[in-house]
Amino acid sequence: MKNSRSAAVRILPYFLLAVALMALSYPVVHAPVTHADDQAVPTIGSMAPDFTLDSQEGKPISLHDFKGKWVVLYFYPKDQTPGCTIEAHAFQRDQAQYEAKNAVVVGVSVDTVESHKEWCAKDGMSFKMLSDADKKVVAMYGSTMTIPQAPQLGTLAARNTFIIDPNGKIVKEFIKVNPQGHSEEVLAWLADNAK
């Protein structure tokens, strides 16, 4: 009895971690997206707020670097979690289609540069993954969230995507994205609208 109780105590932290990771993989529809009262949330037709963040290579990347291209700016909660991996793999798989549409995919989360570097190397992602560790850009884009079941994770990026036209204007928003099939959804929108 004593051994089974101590074994249960030893595995409890792993169980709690597994629950937190499962919560991250669950579509964000079930997690509250929080917006501070003073938080600027861009709208369709407005100029996309510019920013500079470090990429997985540790190099600063600015939104204005992509002027003249369509930008698929997608926010996601956490590197190497199931839902985020599904979404990132699909964006990577479809890179040639994005390039053919003069579009670039840019991922943003609150993970560190080192975390992005490790994940991109492990899973072969070549598009830009930007680190917003201080959470300023996710707030600028109204894309912050918390997971009540995993408060230890703090504020994360909500799974939202913004399509920015070659002039820097927000032309489409996908809010509370389901990672399954999202790249196809974005490509379909670009096929109909990116002329």
Predicted regions and their residues:
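Thiol-/selenol-based redox modules, centered on thioredoxin-like
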Residues: 153-195
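Short active-site neighborhood of thiol/selenol oxidoreductases, capturing the structured segment around
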Residues: 62-85
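N-terminal secretory signal peptides that target proteins for export/translocation
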Residues: 1-9
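Short loop/turn microsegments at loop-to-beta-strand junctions
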Residues: 48-49, 70, 158-160
